[in-house]
């Protein structure tokens, strides 16, 4: 049973990757940071999740600097918009962290979520379930994942109120993708065909993730 904890990184054979889904507004949305631990066989374990509202600019900088000191991540993938680019630039200015911007489009968002699904279905992603906090976060993740599906019009969409945990995890997973790993491209699935087709069935949902 894996437990979420902000502890020390393992010395040998493990790498760490971070995904950040920032809040659009400080008072409405959740700011989510997810840390993945990846072993030499590309097995991935969620080792830290920070999900909070009302996170100010400087506070978020300090969160990521602390995570950087503890885990020494190979990469931080940060979902950016016009305002978030100022944040990632400042983070680069005050640290030596490898921060990459992820400019979100509908297509790119769907691609990273589909690739997250592929890792789950292949048994490569381990969810924390070892204590109450870990179970709560995992249950929220499952709930968000269950809201994603391909619609009758061929669009891959989430219909829940929030997708911040899924996006944070999907970004961390995308950061960890090595050149040897296969990566699903939506063009290959014809998800954006004008004529809807049953090309791909989302495995998300409570029946798609087993605990």
Predicted regions: what is each one?
Residues 1-103, 110, 114, 127-211:
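RNase H-like, metal-dependent nuclease domains and their acidic two-metal-ion catalytic environment used
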